[in-house]
Amino acid sequence: MAAHRSWLLVSFFLLEVLLLEAAKILTISTLSASHYILMNRVSQILQGGGHDVIKLLYEGGDIPDFRKENSSYQVINWRLPEDQQKTFENRWHRLIDEYAYGRSKYHTLLKIHQYFADLCSHLLSRKDIMELLQKENFDLVLLDSMDLCSFLIVEKLGKRFVSFLPFQFSYMDFGLPNAPLSYAPVYGSGLTDQMDFWGRVKNILMFFHFTKKRRDIFSQYGNTVQEHFAEGSQPVLSDLLLKAELWFVNSDFALDFARPLFPNTVYVGGLLDKPVQPIPQDLEDFISQFGDSGFVLVALGSVVSMIQSKEIIKEMNSAFAHLPQGVLWTCKSSHWPKDVSLAPNVKIMDWLPQIDLLAHPSIRLFVTHGGMNSVMEAVHHGVPMVGIPFFGDQPENMVRVEAKNLGVSIQLQTLKAESFLLTMKEVIEDQRYKTAAMASKVIRQSHPLTPAQRLVGWIDHILQTGGAAHLKPYAFQQPWHEQYMLDVFLFLLGLTLGTLWLSVKVLVAVTRYLSISRKVKQA
C-alpha cells in the first residue's frame, strides 16, 4: 500500500513537470551565510524542477566558503564599490559586537535594519542591475522575507512573488495570518503554547510590543522608499508583505507548535537535507579513539563565530576537556587564542561536514547556536542539542527545542565552564532527550512528500493558476476593526446597553404609573 502510494506521488510529480513549461524565476539573496545557504538550496531545487532560475546575490555577505560553488543556475552578482565595501563591513562587525555586548539589543536591532536599508539604497541605485532584472521579465520572484529590501525590489519590477520565511512562524511576524494569543506565542516572548494565566497576560502585552517593534523596523526603510519611489506611488512595507502569493516556512511541526494556517502557508523545513556521505578518514580516525563514548559536534554559525571572545573560547574548551567524548568543533584556527591550549579530546577545523556528522552513529550531542537550518538538521537525524542562542530567531528556536525535550539552552553572555559541562552531561546521559529526539525524527521523516517536492509542487501550482487569489482569505483586505469584529462587538454592546436602558425606562414608567393609579384609588 505504501509502495503504491509512493508510486502515485512520484507519477503525479513527474506529470506536473512534463505538463508545465519552464518558468523564469528570480531568487534574491542579500543576507548572511545561513540565508545564502538556504536560498542557494531553494534555487537548486527549482532549477532541478525544470525552471530557469536566476539569483541576485550580494557578494559582500559573509559567505566565502560557498561563493566558490559551481551553481546549476545563473547568478547576478553585485557589490559595493571597494571604498564603501570596507566601510560597510566594518560597520556590520561593530553592530554585531554591539548587539552581543551592548545594553540595548532593541536599539542595536534598529541600527542593523538601518544598515540593511542603506545597503538597499545602493542596490536600487544600480541602474545597470535594475534594468537587467526588468529586461529578464521574470514569471515569478522568490524572496527571503527577512530581507525587507527584496520586497521593494519586487515592487520596482512589478512581478508576482512568493515569500520564504527562513525561521519560525510567529504571530504577526511578517504579515502572516494570526492565531489565538491564548496558545500562539508572540515572537520574542520566550513562551510555549502551554501558557498559564500570567503567561497569557505576558503574551498579549508582547503582542502590542512586537507590533510597535515591527513598525519601528519598517520605519528604518522610510528614506529608502522616499528616495527610490515617486511621491504618490510610495509603497507601505506592511502592505507589500500581504501581496505574497505564498508563504513558505522553514520549519516543521516536529519542532514547531501546532497552530491553524491559511491555505497559502506551506511548511518546508528540512530543505537542506541531502543523502549522507561517508566522512573523511581523518575524522573517522579521531572519532574511533573514543569508542562507545562517541563524540560531540560543535557548530555555532557564522554570526556567533564572529563575536566569540577569548574568554568564551577558553570556558568552552575547559568544559570540553572534562568530557569522555571526543569533540569536533567548527572554529577557525585564526580565531583561536594563542595562550589557550587545545584540550586533548578536541579537534578544531575551519569547516566540518555537519549533516554527515549528525548522521554518524557515534554522535551523542550537538552544540549549536540554534539557527533554524542547524536545528532542523539535528531534528532530522534525531540528535539531542545544547543551544547557545545569540541572534535573531535562535532564542525562539531553542524555546521549542526545550519544550519538545530535544535539548537545553544556555546563554552565551553568562557561559561558564562548570555549568556548560553539567548541561552537556545532562543532555547526553538523560535518555529522555534522546527518546524525544528520535520521536521527532520519525515525525520529521514520515511526511508523504519531501520538503523539495512541496516547494516545487506549490510553485508549479501558482504558475499554472496565475497566482494564489483562491488561497488568500478576504481578511487580507479587511480593515483591522472588521478583522477583529470590533464594529460588531460595539454594535451588539450598544444594542444590549440600549435595550437595558429602554427596559429600565419602561419599568420606571410602569412603576410610576401603578403608583399614581394606586394613590388615585385610595383618594
Swiss-Prot record:
A Pfam family the protein falls into: UDPGT
Domain of life (superkingdom): Eukaryota
CDD domains hit by this protein: GT1_Gtf-like
Record membrane topology: Single-pass type I membrane protein
Residues carrying covalently attached carbohydrate according to the record: 70
Entries under InterPro entries matching the protein: UDP-glycosyltransferase (IPR050271), UDP_glucos_trans (IPR002213), UDP_glycos_trans_CS (IPR035595)
Cytoplasmic side: 509-523
Stretches in topological domain Extracellular: 23-487
Residues annotated as signal peptide: 1-22
Reactions that this protein is recorded to catalyse: glucuronate acceptor + UDP-alpha-D-glucuronate = acceptor beta-D-glucuronoside + UDP + H(+)
Any one of the GO BP annotations: cellular response to genistein
Tissue expression profile of the protein: Highly expressed in kidney, while it is expressed at low levels in liver. Not detected in other tissues examined.
Alphabetically ordered keywords of this record: Glycoprotein, Glycosyltransferase, Membrane, Signal, Transferase, Transmembrane, Transmembrane helix
UniProt main location, coarse: membrane
MF terms (GO), sorted A to Z: glucuronosyltransferase activity; UDP-glycosyltransferase activity
Transmembrane segments: 488-508
Key word Signal present: yes
GO CC aspect terms: UDP-N-acetylglucosamine transferase complex
Entry keyword Ion transport: no
EC number of this enzyme: 2.4.1.17
Subcellular location: Membrane
Function of the molecule: UDP-glucuronosyltransferases catalyze phase II biotransformation reactions in which lipophilic substrates are conjugated with glucuronic acid to increase water solubility and enhance excretion. They are of major importance in the conjugation and subsequent elimination of potentially toxic xenobiotics and endogenous compounds.
Family of this protein: Belongs to the UDP-glycosyltransferase family.
PANTHER family: EG:EG0003.4 PROTEIN-RELATED, UDP-GLUCURONOSYLTRANSFERASE 3A2
Protein name, entry field: UDP-glucuronosyltransferase 3A1
